[in-house]
A protein has these predicted regions:
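N-terminal capping segments
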Residues: 1-73, 86, 181-199
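A short macromolecule-binding patch
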Residues: 148-155
Length: 199
């Protein structure tokens, strides 16, 4: 399922929405996984990847992000989670973002292995907070482990400010031979936010 990648580029985004305890709990759960080498909730262990982290975070609130989906609904794990949000929550592009929101990305790696950046819904993270300049801080898993990442949709093409503050982390690895149109920063690869808990 394809969603726009440019809907908020350069617009006034993002601000944190009014805090709701259940959403705060999701954000705190995501932060609690930082640096962990396993994603576990009770007796359940999740795969050590971005989808597994999202599943584990939401499991802390009794939410199964694969609930109601057939085995192939949505394709990969990220696509399945996106489909769940479409069915049970709200896909949006800001300008307000909730703690615990899911944040989806396109083209973070060559999923279909054809050498082109044409891979929808390849990564997901969980929003922890929004900084005063609108930079979204989210928790996700990449090859280095479970870490915090930043994304600024007002400056999607800028990695750092002049004083060294990170606005957009690198989310796609650079490879020799990448097509000229390949993008690498979080703000460039942003697909959408997803809200499941609204009260």
């Amino acid at each position: 399922m394809m969603v726009p990648t440019t809907g908020t580029r350069g617009e006034i985004c993002c601000a944190i929405a009014d805090r709701i305890p259940a959403q705060e709990s999701l954000a705190q759960a995501a932060a609690g996984f930082l640096g962990q080498s396993r994603i576990e909730m009770g007796y359940r262990r999740f795969t050590l990847d971005c989808s597994g982290l999202a599943l584990g975070v939401y499991a802390t609130q009794g939410i199964d992000l694969y609930s109601g989906l057939g085995k192939l609904d949505g394709g990969n794990g990220v696509g399945r989670i996106f489909t769940h949000v479409v069915q049970h929550g709200r896909i949006h592009y800001g300008p307000t973002v909730h703690p615990g929101d899911l944040v989806f990305f396109h083209n973070t790696w060559d999923f279909n292995r054809d050498g082109f950046p044409n891979d929808p819904l390849t990564h997901v993270g969980v929003v922890e907070k929004v900084e005063v300049d609108g930079t979204v801080v989210f928790v996700s898993w990449v090859s280095a482990g479970i870490e915090r990442y930043r994304m600024n949709l007002q400056e999607p093409d800028q990695h750092k400010t002049g004083d060294g503050r990170v606005l957009n982390d690198f989310m796609r690895r650079k490879w020799p031979g990448d097509p000229q149109a390949t993008r690498y920063l979080t703000g460039q690869l942003f697909a959408a936010f997803g809200t499941l808990i609204s009260r």
